């Protein structure tokens, strides 16, 4: 680790001399030995969370499975009624929910209301507004593409997948758990949801919300590793999990065991890239630090590290410090808006990373890390190399490593050498930003901002590769939790028996050559791109001519098939 004038080393960051002792280990042992009433520590002490008895989990699953097979959730009116009850429960328990999140991770109630509670309430309203339209079948003009489907009717119905499990996370314990639950219910599924035991106050408050709803439609399982393990053994039709990649693989294996669908919202190291042609560094600094310090950096789409063009670094760093001061003051530990680390184990992990880095600490505040308060101040680390300890894992902390680059392609190469991130932020002129997006992969990408894309419920949120599988919010949640069921309806009287023999054996022999030729024209006519002549392309371009083009074939088939039909009758 290096130090410079006006910069500090790591030692003032630690207030407790035993900062690196994992005093949380006994708590985890206690969690595993007392399943009925478990004391779980949080930012403001402990909460006694009642875990679901393991022996009850299969019966809870059976109850909601029966609720689905009863067919009540196929009714749009019943779904809407449950969504309204959901909304009623949220509003009745709003204060309890906001208080609970504050007790768990010291997140300001106003912040929780803005980014979590309001998001769920809005999502319910979106589904109540659009459920009728989104549930309508899609109708496709079959005969216009393939003449064999003349007089047929095809539709794609949006049907519920069945019984769904949603496993939430502690860092946004209302939003992350309840947004997918809203989509699953609106799509007609029944749900078992599992709140995070690391946010015990919120887990208990969420369970009170569910009491306003039909228990055959939605239930809650509380618990830790053992309870979750048993829960994942149930034969759910879809598994939805938000959390880290290690547990994500466990959930994926559980889904594979039942050949069920799975959605994984994971994370990764989401970079912010600041290129030399960006127009104004002040909003750049503000938006980066907002995403970095919100919820004390414990956000899956927070800026994990900063890639900045060498020519801008010295100008940007003091602006980053100013942005932190503007949001949380010069003593963020005293700020009502600055969060806390979720538990001692996470606090210790973060402090070990700060000890291991070889970067240079930039003076942001005189506040020191405080284990008893689970507080870590904003930390900016300059001069970080690609192989630094801070670059080995997702930080999930109020730490911003800064890496400089000389060319945009150098920054792109570094992003591509790592796992695909959940989010990618680019601050640059339009052409440069498009160059980055076109040459990288990420779950989402934002130009000239960070984090704010989470507020959009008309676009998909999800990862790619190690950062996740699938997506959700709004219409995309409805699609995730729906099975697209293709239904084809055909008349018995058409086509005529002679023409209908085109698709049936025998196919071989010269006498059946007409079948092969007519069948190809009817079922798989050459698409326009595969036709050679302009004339044939014109006929394909005008869909109705596809139908007219096979009429002579129909007539020929009728004539040639009459003797065959007569012989069969004899």
Regions found by a protein language model. Give the residues of each.
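Rossmann-like NAD(P) dinucleotide-binding subdomain of oxidoreductase/dehydrogenase enzymes
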Residues: 145-283, 534-539, 551-563
């Amino acid at each position: 680790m290096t130090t410079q004038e006006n910069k500090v080393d790591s030692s003032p960051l630690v207030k407790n001399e035993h900062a690196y002792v994992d005093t949380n280990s006994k708590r985890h042992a206690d969690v595993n030995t007392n399943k009925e009433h478990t004391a779980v520590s949080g930012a403001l002490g402990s909460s006694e969370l009642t875990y679901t008895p393991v022996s009850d989990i299969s019966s809870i699953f059976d109850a909601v499975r029966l609720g689905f097979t009863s067919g009540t959730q196929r009714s749009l009116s019943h779904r809407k009624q449950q969504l309204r009850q959901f909304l009623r429960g949220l509003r009745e328990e709003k204060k309890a929910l906001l208080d609970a999140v504050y007790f768990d991770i010291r997140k300001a109630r106003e912040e929780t209301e803005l980014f979590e509670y309001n998001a769920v309430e809005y999502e319910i309203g979106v589904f109540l507004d659009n459920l009728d339209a989104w549930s309508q079948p899609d109708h496709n003009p079959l005969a216009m593409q393939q003449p064999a489907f003349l007089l047929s009717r095809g539709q794609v119905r949006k049907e519920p997948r069945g019984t769904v499990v949603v496993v939430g996370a502690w860092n946004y314990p209302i939003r992350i758990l309840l947004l997918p639950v809203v989509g699953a219910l609106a799509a007609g599924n029944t749900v078992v949801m599992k709140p995070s035991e690391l946010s015990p106050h919120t887990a208990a408050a969420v369970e009170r919300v569910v009491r306003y709803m039909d228990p055959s439609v939605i239930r809650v399982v509380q618990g830790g590793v053992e309870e979750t393990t048993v829960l994942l053994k149930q034969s759910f039709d879809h598994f939805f999990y938000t959390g880290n990649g290690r547990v994500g693989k466990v959930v994926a294996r559980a889904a594979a065991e039942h050949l069920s669908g799975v959605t994984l919202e994971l994370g990764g190291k989401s970079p912010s890239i600041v290129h030399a042609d960006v127009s104004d560094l002040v909003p750049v600094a503000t938006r980066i630090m907002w995403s970095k310090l919100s919820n004390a950096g414990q956000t899956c789409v927070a800026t994990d590290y900063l890639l900045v063009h060498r020519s801008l670094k010295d100008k940007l760093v003091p602006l980053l410090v100013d942005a932190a001061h503007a949001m949380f003051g010069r003593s963020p530990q005293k700020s009502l808006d600055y969060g806390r680390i979720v538990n001692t184990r996470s606090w210790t992990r973060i402090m070990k990373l700060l000890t291991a880095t070889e970067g240079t600490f930039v003076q942001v505040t005189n506040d020191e890390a405080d284990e008893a308060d689970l507080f870590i101040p904003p930390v900016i680390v300059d001069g970080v190399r690609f192989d630094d300890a801070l670059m080995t894992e997702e930080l999930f902390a109020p730490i911003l490593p800064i890496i400089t680059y000389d060319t945009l392609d150098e920054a792109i190469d570094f992003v591509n050498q790592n796992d695909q991130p959940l989010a990618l932020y680019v601050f640059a002129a339009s052409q440069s930003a498009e160059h980055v997006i076109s040459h990288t992969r990420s779950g989402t990408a934002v130009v000239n901002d960070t984090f704010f894309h989470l507020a959009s419920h008309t676009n998909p949120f999800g990862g790619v590769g190690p950062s996740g599988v699938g997506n959700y919010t709004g219409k995309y949640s409805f699609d995730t939790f729906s099975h697209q069921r293709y239904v084809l309806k055909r008349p018995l009287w058409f086509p005529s028996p002679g023409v209908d023999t085109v698709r049936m054996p025998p196919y071989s022999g010269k006498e059946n050559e007409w079948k092969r030729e007519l069948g190809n024209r009817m079922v798989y006519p050459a698409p326009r791109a595969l036709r050679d002549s302009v004339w044939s392309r014109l006929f394909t371009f005008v869909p109705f001519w596809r139908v007219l083009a096979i009429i002579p074939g129909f007539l020929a088939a009728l004539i040639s098939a009459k003797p065959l039909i007569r012989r069969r009758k004899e």
